[in-house]
Regions:
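Short conserved motifs of the RecA-like P-loop NTPase core
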Residues: 101, 165-167, 178-190, 214-218, ...
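C-terminal helical "lid" of AAA+/P-loop NTPase domains
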Residues: 184-190, 196-210, 233-236, 247-252, ...
Length: 320
């Protein structure tokens, strides 16, 4: 897969994120005293890649033996995490760089419950002599304060369009794929700033391209045109009291076009403040509603039911 083939392996290769890279370099000047780290920011901005680059620099050839990668949302509970870290900490050996600890990379920490995070804090305390932690999350606000206070925090921002497209161009060159600027811009826009998603889309499109030439027409299925107009039409119907029309538009977006519920809400969040039919107070209330239903979907609620309920509430809001 291209995302692994072209994943940066050193800090020099990391795309954008100069502030974070410079901060990490400063810490790595004294590797034996490096603190626990917390990386937060949107998906596909290089958090996991940065963690692995740090691990390679610290552990060298002992990388696989002295680094434990865990995904908080995949594990069966904090008890499993505790036992794996306990077993890992008991076999720590000195790395070539002189560090005398292992590195635990724990992804999606903001998906853990507060109770699980409290238990994780205790694990970090009891394992501090033999382990350093790199915690990765999308939202820093989802991490309890006692953990944040024990970490050096690095905030990853969305990648600059220019930097991301330059990286996509370098991949195309390496793979002997020709792609014009407008094609790469469409891929970037489709990705929403998620470089991992952009690279995956680029690979799928390149696989189906003819004679190594990537054109806009080939992107229609994997990187469709912006759905802002359709989402705006859906919102307008709801605001004007036509709930059934709004729901039909929602079903078309989800069923026929394959747009996820959370993608619809993200687009709606941009578009609802542009509706002249809602005064500023109602726009604020609509944004609050969108946030509430986005959270419900993030917790695994049914998309059809939640988006229908959201449109019903927006319809009621428009009639006030």
């Amino acid at each position: 897969m291209w995302i692994e083939k072209y994943r940066p392996r050193t800090l020099d290769e990391v795309v954008d994120q100069r502030d974070s890279v410079d901060g990490i370099r400063a810490l790595l000047k004294t590797p034996a005293t490096i603190p626990h780290l917390l990386f937060s920011g949107p998906p596909g901005t290089g958090k996991s890649t940065m963690a692995l680059c740090i691990a390679r620099q610290l552990m060298g050839e002992s990388f696989r033996r002295l680094v434990l990668e865990l995904n908080a949302s995949d594990e069966r509970g904090i008890g499993v995490v505790r036992e794996r870290i306990k077993g890992f900490s008991q076999v720590i050996q000195t790395a070539p760089s002189g560090v005398q600890f292992g590195l635990v990379i724990l992804d999606e920490c903001d998906e853990m419950t507060r109770d699980a995070q409290t238990a994780l804090r205790r694990i970090m305390e009891t394992s501090s002599r033999t382990c350093r932690f790199i915690l990765i999350c999308n939202y820093q606000s989802g991490i309890i304060e006692p953990i944040q206070s024990r970490c050096s925090i690095f905030r990853f921002r969305q990648l600059e369009k220019r930097e991301a497209i330059a990286y996509l161009k370098s991949i195309c060159k390496a793979e002997n794929v020709s792609a014009d600027q407008d094609v790469l811009e469409r891929v970037f826009e489709f990705s929403g700033g998620d470089l991992r998603r952009a690279i995956n889309a680029l690979q799928v499109a390149a696989t189906s391209s003819k004679a190594g030439k990537l054109e806009l027409a080939q992107l229609s299925k994997i990187a469709p045109e912006d759905e802002s107009d359709s989402v705006r039409t859906m919102l307008l119907a709801a605001v004007q009291g036509n709930f059934l029309k709004a729901r039909d538009q929602m079903y078309e977006l989800m069923g026929k076009r394959g747009i996820s519920g959370r993608e619809i809400i993200r687009t709606a969040n941009r578009e609802v403040v542009k509706l002249a039919e809602l005064d500023s107070r109602k726009q604020v209330e609509a944004v609050r509603l969108l946030g509430e239903y986005d959270f419900r979907l993030s917790q695994g609620a049914n998309e059809d039911i939640q988006l229908s309920a959201m449109l019903a509430q927006i319809s009621l809001l428009g009639s006030k």
